[in-house]
């Protein structure tokens, strides 16, 4: 079994070529033009030829279509009849809105969250700081509250928990 049986490889190649060519080549369908037979007519019709119709030399000359078109002497704006324009009536506008709508800061982690400023400052009255890199939030009772620079501010601890932030504990610090 050391030698390749070359005759089997050749037979497989030949069989593959025969099957491929057999399946790829389809029988040719010849389409033949069938003429309608005219009963009782033995006269042969002439084959169609392309002929140019003869031009009679004595015919009258037609005018070009552009010669019949009239040129407008007035502008289009002058041709449109204008009815009397109604006088412009002023629209009443309220001077000041009845109630001021508070501006809500952009909430990156849902309602009750706000982005921190460049210096880490947040909205007034919001005491919960958050770090988006560690997903931890800090309350004023935590010992690391003051040195922590906030990336996100939360209105309360429930808002931070809804945003899937976890509270800071001594056990969460890596040592």
From Swiss-Prot:
Q: Which Gene Ontology terms of cellular component type are present? A: peptidoglycan-based cell wall; plasma membrane
Knockout consequence? Upon operon disruption no reduction of serine uptake at pH 6.9, no visible effect on outer membrane permeability, however severe delays in ammonia secretion, medium pH neutralization and growth also occur at pH 5.5.
Q: Where in the cell is it found?
A: Cell membrane
Name the predominant localization.
membrane
Q: Which UniProt keywords apply?
A: Cell membrane, Membrane, Transmembrane, Transmembrane helix
Residues that span the membrane, as ranges: 4-26
Instruction: Give the induction note.
Output: Part of the arfA-arfB-arfC operon. Maximal expression of ArfA requires the full operon.
Family stated for the protein in its record: Belongs to the ArfC membrane protein family.
What protein name applies here?
A: Uncharacterized membrane protein ArfC
Organism encoding this protein: Mycobacterium tuberculosis (strain ATCC 25618 / H37Rv)
Per UniProt, what is the name of the gene that codes for the protein in this document? arfC
């Amino acid at each position: 079994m050391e030698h390749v049986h070359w005759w089997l490889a050749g037979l497989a190649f030949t069989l593959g070529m025969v099957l491929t060519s057999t399946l790829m080549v389809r029988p040719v369908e010849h389409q033949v033009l069938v003429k309608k037979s005219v009963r009782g007519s033995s006269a042969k019709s002439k084959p169609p030829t392309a002929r140019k119709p003869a031009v009679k030399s004595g015919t009258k000359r037609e005018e070009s279509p552009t010669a019949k078109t009239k040129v407008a002497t007035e502008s289009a704006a002058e041709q449109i009849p204008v009815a009397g324009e109604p006088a412009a009536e002023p629209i009443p506008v309220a001077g000041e809105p009845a109630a001021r709508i508070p501006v809500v800061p952009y909430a990156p982690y849902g309602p009750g969250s706000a982005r921190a400023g460049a210096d880490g400052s947040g909205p007034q009255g919001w005491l919960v700081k958050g770090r988006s890199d560690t997903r931890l939030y800090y309350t004023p009772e935590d010992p690391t509250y003051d040195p922590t620079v906030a990336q996100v501010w939360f209105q309360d601890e429930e808002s931070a928990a809804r945003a899937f932030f976890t509270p800071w504990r001594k056990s969460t610090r890596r040592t």
